[in-house]
């Protein structure tokens, strides 16, 4: 679609002429004005519409305001065992907003970004509450098993003369409010925001009680929910009842256990959210014909649409732009996207004119590599001052197991950990990510992601316990236990869709010494060593190249989630933190830039912005000691990317070229959460004409990033 500064006099004249021609040719009975009815997309089910006044409740902060979002006091439900839908919504917005951005004043919240900072970057005295309406519905393929949540927010400030919309597909494996902090940009601009949980979600199917979540997060029994369940697990070889009798207290999560490999459809679901958004906008603002039928007054050609989000949501936005055959998307602005290139893309990535050690690998490839090596690498002497560093006997034991399996070398723990860190470098992690390995290890990040994606790609049932893993709440003895009713009742709001989350942990069901046991403290059966389940990590890794039925199923799933690289000439900005330790730039945004040039050539309008001293989890900046000293918020650069793409689409202003942005860490005492206040000088703008030393060069099949 093309937008000429919202001036469409020529289009209007053409439309008028077309209407006259239709009448002259006897086209249609328009005597009642019902010429273009606003038909709800066929995939959309029952729609719930809720208005929010912008005072007691609102679209962005659920009535909490800027101060409420920043408060450490969560808006817990009045009756924790039976929260209302409204309470769960408020709690979900609070939790998910704080999971994406740093909400500390020292980190820039309230001064450089946040609800009280307006669309022009001015700090206001208000709380940033935004009145408007929400449209909520499932998208389904007719089976009642897909039930992807769709949500559209339309602020009361929506400008019908300059209509706009952005997408905010959920990040990670989160629920529909997972990217509410991204939606903030659109709401402030008076744009509609189209959200989707993309077939993932935070609330589990509790197999003990056989209860499941509904679309609003409230829970009921599986039989009572029927096809209205947001997610209900299906059995594998065993029935769910037989499985639970043998293996009690387990939980099934939609991303891991839906048996649908939802990632293959993240682009489709994002496009469906846009279509739902267009319908909702016209349901609200379309003219009504004399026969009472609402019309599609604001056609998609009149609405500026930017696909946006972060992490998995950012990858979904890129996928949607690639798959957009109907002109739904005008531009793309994403941060730290999960991008999987085809193994044969053969993109050469260079840093400082020197080829990097590895690039363009699939997420499942590098996350299973991290799952083997990262725990040991976190013990490296070079990382003793890194955030969350601590000597860990389980990780030290992992080092020895890696040596025994000839994956690293060394006779001392120091040498072994250094070897593991070197192996991560050889696998494509940049040295700037080194300081992140201890904290990512602490949260068992690589294991939880590897297990989730292995199950998803292989379309495994929860009853399959792929590689001997399951999900369950644990108590002080680290063994599976019944999840507390109050915790389960609020997991729609508090969970992130993968363990560890809300007391739920990853379980090693093959620990012969303890029985089922929390993964990070468990014993490998192959060596009777408490090495945080090396056996499970190796099993997950072997699925990538194995030949048995489970490995073949996983490899088939992986083949379905790869990008094409063709954005069809859409203006696009990708921002990514150079230090990202979860989705390393060498495997994601850097090679995608080259892949896009390979596919589009001179037609490409993609720019890539690499931000120094930025990493994947902005929320950790104010929460984990040591992050605030080292890292700046990438979220601020997503805001700037959205500004740039919007300006390009509405005024024709050129997008900034690909570049490295040289930020300045806040500094201060090492490993505190109270670094000096983030100032504008710490986070310089994206340059319209970067110095030569900061320019990223891209050509067909090649990318060169300066040091």
UniProtKB/Swiss-Prot annotation:
It is an enzyme of class 3 (hydrolase). Keywords: Hydrolase, Secreted, Signal. It catalyses: (3R)-hydroxybutanoate dimer + H2O = 2 (R)-3-hydroxybutanoate + H(+). Pfam families: 3HBOH. Residues 1-24 form the signal peptide. Pathway: Lipid metabolism; butanoate metabolism. This is D-(-)-3-hydroxybutyrate oligomer hydrolase. It comes from Cupriavidus pinatubonensis (strain JMP 134 / LMG 1197).
